[in-house]
Amino acid sequence: MDLDLASILKGEISKKKKELANSKGVQPPCTEKFQPHESANIDETPRQVEQESTDEENLSDNQSDDIRTTISKLENRPERIQEAIAQDKTISVIIDPSQIGSTEGKPLLSMKCNLYIHEILSRWKASLEAYHPELFLDTKKALFPLLLQLRRNQLAPDLLISLATVLYHLQQPKEINLAVQSYMKLSIGNVAWPIGVTSVGIHARSAHSKIQGGRNAANIMIDERTRLWITSIKRLITFEEWYTSNHDSLA
């Protein structure tokens, strides 16, 4: 099923125009927010749905002027979504360990994690006949809240550090075991830093250790959404291990 942006936008623009008309009379403008279609099309157009959901954060509908601005944004949203998707293609997915824990590098690191997860999912989708097709869609759906947080640069710093560390080791040849070790730290609530990488300074680690304080609750127990995306990261690690071993044997 393709994402029918045209019909979504047509309905939303019509709603906003009615709100604008009502705001000129006695009735106050409606404050109901448009809910993004987060999961209906996740298998077909995940990045497009992500960008649509992210775009919704910037739409305001509290006053008449805001409604006019919202209508304008809704009308040109497809173009802005396509521009954002095109921009994604210019970003390298290679994670630089020196960026892990850096405040300045956090937005870029978040996007790298987002795009690398998409890359792994693309490889899995291309391998569905050979590798666990029954797990694929559920894994993508479970990862969707994480992908949104990464695109919006809203993932908690300690979770981002641990996730980026897992993905960094996953990108390195023959470091699956280090990725698994880092994943275990992520699961139990410890901050996982790249193992054996001196470019991640002791000062960055110390600063984040102080921010984290004594909290050591298992991340997997924070809430159901967090539990699901963390367990889905383990599925990505397992898939990459299978994918690498199968392609190495064919080389």
From Swiss-Prot:
Assigned keywords, A-Z: mRNA processing, mRNA splicing, Nucleus, Spliceosome
GO cellular component: U2-type post-spliceosomal complex; U4/U6 x U5 tri-snRNP complex; U5 snRNP
Region (Disordered): 17-67
Localisation per UniProt entry: Nucleus
Recorded superkingdom: Eukaryota
GO biological process assignments: generation of catalytic spliceosome for second transesterification step; mRNA splicing, via spliceosome; nuclear mRNA surveillance
Subunit field text: Homodimer. Component of the U4/U6-U5 tri-snRNP complex composed of the U4, U6 and U5 snRNAs and at least PRP3, PRP4, PRP6, PRP8, PRP18, PRP31, PRP38, SNU13, SNU23, SNU66, SNU114, SPP381, SMB1, SMD1, SMD2, SMD3, SMX2, SMX3, LSM2, LSM3, LSM4, LSM5, LSM6, LSM7, LSM8, BRR2 and DIB1.
Protein name listed in UniProt: Pre-mRNA-splicing factor 18
Organism of origin: Saccharomyces cerevisiae (strain ATCC 204508 / S288c)
